[in-house]
């Protein structure tokens, strides 16, 4: 599982707790990276690795394929409209894998050719791609 814009690492940690064998979390902020590492130590999690860096630089070099990619970018991220293409064109999503992008109401991915559905929970939207 790949957790992009990992923040506090909650999604990756939850995936580990639900049986994910390996999680890679990418976060640019040093404070959040340290928080994730600290939480993993406290919880005894050994199969979550944290990469501190820019998500787009990570993606440009990534060669690993994932069955689940979750991205929670800042809603005002300039590259947000192109994020599905940036990820999917890298060919890092396994066949039958899922890409999930969290976003606000002002972003609409429904016209993307690999968009499957969008779910809304209050002001938060999750768009699913295959």
What does each model-found stretch correspond to?
Residues 1-130:
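Class I S-adenosyl-L-methionine-dependent methyltransferase catalytic core
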